[in-house]
């Protein structure tokens, strides 16, 4: 397995072609499954719905997240996390960790290659699905249901959510040493803000007369958890401000991942 030219300076570029190809060979199947899942839950379901479901013939869609909303949300929150877990698995195996860190590459270069490969794995399926959906707007029956603007909004939102979940999973992977534990911690941390606010609201409603009930606080709670946000996107779409917040969070967690990676003791790999 040839990952670089012997003697190559590690300062030349963050991109290493050999490592990138190896990552795609190892983890490219995730991208293929992600693409097939998105095609099944959106283009195929829309074609079937137009032909068999009278509701879709009467009213245009509010947004594309209403199509198989629960299944679609599940796909969007599972595949990026799986990708993040797999591209950081080398840190949790002593042999793989030793192999990666014996390469003539700095840790920052290794992590940059992993993030780049992971980003392509989760983004390419979303972009291809967006392209398919854009072509479908040329169909007379389907163009009544949704427009190009709806497709691009879905594509941007799905891309941002996928990228954030990937980056956050990599960040957690820098802190823990087991893949299963990493996955559990990711979902717990993503739900934790909404759970804490809900518990605080229950406590305050019990002791403060006139404190607003959960129905008044529901929107704020839904915005606090990326997982809840995805599952409620069919009736509460993300705003452009929300997307900018996710971009900012991605930048923060990428920076923290690089910082933690530089300080991580590889000998702790199990």
Name each region found by the language model:
Residues 2-35:
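Aromatic- and glycine-rich beta-strand/loop motifs that create alpha-glucan
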Residues 2-6, 10-12, 48-66, 195-269:
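Terminal transmembrane helical anchor/hairpin motif
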Residues 25-29, 33, 86, 108-129, ...:
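Alpha-helical transmembrane segments of multi-pass membrane proteins
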Residues 26-53, 71-82, 186-196:
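Hydrophobic alpha-helical transmembrane segments of multi-pass membrane transport/permease proteins
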Residues 62-66, 117-177, 186, 194-198, ...:
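Secretory targeting signals
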Residues 67-96:
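Long, hydrophobic alpha-helical segments
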Residues 76-82, 159-169, 245-258:
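Hydrophobic cores of alpha-helical transmembrane segments in multi-pass inner/ER membrane proteins
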Residues 87-120, 269:
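Helix-loop-helix units of permease transmembrane domains in multi-pass membrane transporters
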